[in-house]
Design a protein with these regions (language model features):
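Metal-cofactor-dependent catalytic cores
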Residues: 1-264
């Protein structure tokens, strides 16, 4: 059976919940609107589920004009995105970039929810990927994360309780590559005809404590890192999925055929 794109997910707010899509425009920075917003502390350092597990319960949606964020037990935040305003110097890991501050009302909403002082910023400018010669917004280092459905099935076959794909927060899920087939692929074409896109898979994704965080409740456990460590430790890190960079832009659609153009 040919490989097929089965899931598309965008994350408008870094470390917030994902939004499943049936189609998405692929830009140099990844899926349109992906990681366009981010929370930072007073020093400009990004906030994430690594230190604030409650961020898993945030449900953002963004249409290019309004960012709506829902969380259990609170009135939703409906925020009109600000294009111009104070520009803050911010940091994602060791990468310095800038974001437009989105104002006091949004900051207060998130601060009250997370019980920590923070500001909401919107990406502006340019930021290079960690490697591969691409661009990225507020994602950790790469604009896309690709995981095969069979890779998760392989992992779940080793776990006492299966886990959903959202633990790994991929952009693209592909069925038909085989378990860890994404590790063997270097370039893919997704779609057919003039609208087809191409991506280059450039680096295995190192996994962190976020994978142990239930994306519905924010509660943490020991899996999947405990099991992944037994068979997916590569280059002194636990790896699952492949970071990727767009090479040919266009529109992605769930159900698109996937062709591996080049292997490792």
């Amino acid at each position: 059976m040919p490989a097929t794109l089965t899931e598309l997910t965008v994350y408008p707010l870094k470390s917030g919940g994902g939004t499943a899509l049936s189609s998405a425009e692929l830009l140099p920075t990844g899926l349109r609107f992906d990681r366009e917003f981010m929370l930072v502390n007073p020093e400009g350092r990004f906030l994430s589920q690594r230190d604030h597990a409650a961020m898993a319960r945030l449900r953002p949606a963004y249409d290019g004009t309004e960012l709506t964020v829902r969380a259990d037990g609170r009135e939703p935040l409906v925020h009109k995105a600000v294009d111009e305003g104070p520009v803050r110097d911010v940091t994602v890991h060791r990468s310095d970039c800038q974001g437009v501050d989105q104002g006091d009302e949004a900051a207060a909403w998130f601060a009250g929810l997370l019980d920590t002082e923070c500001r909401l910023v919107r990406f502006t400018g340019h930021r290079p990927t960690s490697r591969g010669g691409g661009e990225v917004a507020f994602a950790d280092g790469y604009p896309l994360l690709v995981i095969s459905a069979e890779s998760l099935a392989d992992l779940n076959g080793r776990l006492a309780e299966p886990l959903p794909m959202n633990r790994f927060r991929p952009s693209l899920v592909i069925d038909g590559l085989g378990a860890f087939g994404e590790d063997r692929a270097r370039r893919m074409r997704i779609g057919a005809g003039p609208d087809a896109v191409e991506i280059e898979l450039v680096k295995a994704c190192a996994r962190c404590v976020i994978t142990t965080t239930d994306q519905d409740t924010g509660e943490r456990g020991r899996e999947p890192l405990r099991t992944l460590a037994t068979y997916r430790t590569i280059d002194r890190g636990i790896r699952f999925g492949q970071n990727a960079v767009p090479r040919v832009q266009g529109t992605l659609r769930v159900g698109d055929p996937v062709e591996v153009l080049e292997t490792a």
